[in-house]
Swiss-Prot record:
The modification Phosphoserine is found at residues 23, 37, 84. The modification N6-methyllysine is found at residue 39. Its main location: mitochondrion. The modification N6-acetyllysine is found at residue 34. This is Cytochrome b5 type B. GO terms for molecular function: heme binding; metal ion binding. SMART domains: Cyt-b5 (SM01117).
């Protein structure tokens, strides 16, 4: 009966109220994946989890498309449709938490720029052998033409 679970923002007025966002709930992908029915339907858009159960029959795009994305990452499909900013605003109502950081794909690339690095080195891997081959070609021609002329 201690009741000491009250949130800090309820009474705290000592100027430290900026950390409200720390109370984010994290869900694992496997938990979201279980909510894939008409009874309970969650989906993930850009690393955020949305409970769209009560939105199903309100969705202008139909409940079928939502069911197809049930329990999985729907970011791509959501973007492909080109949803309006109104639609994006609506997302907030259904937001229930974030995907656990260790389940996040390196999609947003801010933490893991290794994709760019690989691309850069890809380029180097391509260009170096080509430069080598061209140089060898020139050397070969230089030597063969020299031996012809003398
Ligand atoms: C919670 C997430 C979603 C919300 C709040 C939402 C909201 C909306 C809204 C408001 C519209 C009307 C058009 C607009 O304003 O852009 C719409 C249309 C549509 N949505 Fe969604 N949507 C969501 C998720 C999805 C997903 C995951 C798909 C998967 C493919 C999808 C497919 C569509 C389609 C195909 C239309 C077009 C309907 C038409 O043009 O006739 N939506 N959605």
């Amino acid at each position: 009966m201690s009741g000491s679970m009250a949130t800090a923002e309820a009474s705290g007025s000592d100027g430290k109220g900026q950390e409200v966002e720390t109370s984010v709930t994290y869900y694992r992908l496997e938990e979201v994946a279980k909510r894939n029915s008409l009874k309970e339907l969650w989906l993930v858009i850009h690393g955020r989890v949305y409970d769209v159960t009560r939105f199903l029959n309100e969705h202008p795009g139909g409940e079928e498309v939502l069911l197809e994305q049930a329990g999985v990452d729907a970011s791509e499909s959501f973007e492909d449709v080109g949803h309006s900013s109104d639609a994006r605003e609506m997302l907030k109502q259904y937001y229930i938490g974030d995907i656990h950081p260790s389940d996040l794909k390196p999609e947003s690339g801010s933490k893991d720029p290794s994709k760019n690095d690989t691309c850069k080195s890809c380029w180097a891997y391509w260009i170096l052998p080509i430069i080598g081959a061209v140089l060898l070609g020139f050397l070969y021609r230089y030597y063969t033409s020299e031996s012809k002329s003398s």
